[in-house]
């Protein structure tokens, strides 16, 4: 039902929030098609619903109306397991992570592919190291996550999403917290991918 070669197709979708007594509509009539291999940026003023749209596209919250297809399949029909191997997400939310090395956090991107115990195979470890190298954070790999600056943490979360090896990756403000040279570096990396 999606367009041939499209990764994502949004048709007449409405986004917002349900509460017990009401629904808050953030945006309606959203239409878009994003094709494989494209780097697409969503720009807009603060408060217009960019993050709400991203959370909806990631299936973190339900859409209010319309249709969202990812790889030709309605987002509402994906299981949690299917979502974790289809969509990678990097949010700007800061979570406090203690007692974990950067390499271990990036390795968590492999969790959709590991067994119950989460043990990384030789291939998983290779993918983790490749993801770390792609984002150029090799010097951070053995550091504790809680010691990182905001910009360093952002790069680590991008490496984690890359290690997840999903066909679709959503990034909410991927250059937030980064200094100018790092912003340029991340945008070049995303363009290269």
Enumerate the predicted regions with their spans.
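Conserved ABC ATPase signature
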Residues: 118-119, 144-148, 152
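Conserved ABC transporter NBD signature motif
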Residues: 66-74, 83
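Single conserved hydrophobic/aromatic residue that forms the stacking wall/gate
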Residues: 1-10
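Catalytic Walker B motif of ABC-type/P-loop ATPase nucleotide-binding domains
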Residues: 169-173, 178
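Helix-to-loop junction immediately C-terminal to a conserved catalytic motif
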Residues: 58
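Conserved ABC ATPase "signature" region
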Residues: 107, 122-140, 165
């Amino acid at each position: 039902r999606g367009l041939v070669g499209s990764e994502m197709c949004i048709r007449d979708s409405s986004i917002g929030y349900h509460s017990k007594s009401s629904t808050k509509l953030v945006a309606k009539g959203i239409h878009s098609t994003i094709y494989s291999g494209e780097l697409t940026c969503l720009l807009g003023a603060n408060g217009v619903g960019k993050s709400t749209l991203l959370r909806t596209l990631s299936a973190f919250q339900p859409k209010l109306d319309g249709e969202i297809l990812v790889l030709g399949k309605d987002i509402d029909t994906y299981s949690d397991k299917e979502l974790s191997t289809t969509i990678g997400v990097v949010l700007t939310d800061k979570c406090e992570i203690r007692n974990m090395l950067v390499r271990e956090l990036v390795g968590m991107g492999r969790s959709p592919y590991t067994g119950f115990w989460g043990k990384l195979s030789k291939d998983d470890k290779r993918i983790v190291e490749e993801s770390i190298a792609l984002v150029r954070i090799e010097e951070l790999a053995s550091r504790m996550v809680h010691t990182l600056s905001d910009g360093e943490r952002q790069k680590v979360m991008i490496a984690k999403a890359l290690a997840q090896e999903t066909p679709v990756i959503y990034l909410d403000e991927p250059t937030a917290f980064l200094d100018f040279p790092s912003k340029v570096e991340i945008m070049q990396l995303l363009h290269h991918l």
